[in-house]
Amino acid sequence: MKKFTLKKSSSELHIVHPQQFVIDYKNELNPSQYDAVTSVSGPHLIIAGAGTGKTRTIVYRVARLVELGVKPEHILLLTFTRRASQEMLRRASILLDHRCEKVSGGTFHSFANSVLRKYCTLLGYERGFSILDQSDSEDVMNLIRTRLKLDTKERRFPRKETLHDLYSRSINTVTAVTAILAADYPHYLELEGDMTKVFALYIEYKRAHNLMDYDDLLLNLIRLFREQEAIRAELATYYKYIMVDEYQDTNKLQSEIVAHLGTIHHNVMVVGDDSQSIYSFRGATIRNILDFPDQYEGCKVVKLEENYRSTQAILNVANEILKHAIE
């Protein structure tokens, strides 16, 4: 497992006396939430199951950082939906003030898009590239599939949806197409050569038409970080505090993006549920959350265990099931 070495934080915080805080954090949060919110410097893993106040914890931590004097734009909040980040920042603004609205928040893809809009020419793209959504990507693959005359009465070729699933999963899991075919589509193994041809032409089509699909946004951001050290350092310096929601649902590419951004200040906090991952079909891996303490030296782990939604009887059943769970 690759281990990222992070430099000591150079972030400077104002020393604020508890009586000077606008928010009474200690009385408004339970002990575990308070620990997570007030643990500011260094890498942190917050284990938070459903109903334990995960969102509340993130909202209060955003407010706490702003109260400590961190410029909102230097805080990066990455979530799985734009709506989630907007709601968290809205709540933080109500909790503290309008400064929280200036926090940099959004999805991994929207963040990648914003960076690549500025630096895409360094990767061989023209400014103003267009983005293919999943439906567009499937249609392009179908066009190539048809032009190659791969689907005949004698031999059925995978539909565009299957082709896209194979291609996207291969990228997001960093796994060879052969391995995915063997595991999930063994009846298509003999067609691997033709599929590889479709994928190669798909990549050529995108480059010829100045297009990126959703997977390219992540791939190209990582490529930018790897090839342009000065730009990676600039962004890693700019974002002094990084928070990631639903970390158990991140894939290998997203985990690497977080690692690159955290190499200067060391202030990376990820929040997730180590017993739940619902996006494995998109390449999400629970290993990201399980391996986080080993990847980030000096990581502090905080567990939010007080549940505000379920009855104790339900929690007892859930805990008994989890005792026998496997990865």
Where are these regions (language model features)?
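P-loop NTPase Walker
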Residues: M1-R127, I131, A233, R287, ...
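N-terminal helical cap/lid subdomain that shapes the substrate entry/recognition surface
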Residues: F111, C299-K300
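Proline-centered turn/helix-capping motifs that create local helix->coil transitions or kinks
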Residues: I171-A179, H266, I321-E327
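Coupling/hinge elements of helicase-like and P-loop NTPase modules
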Residues: T152-T162, V302-E327
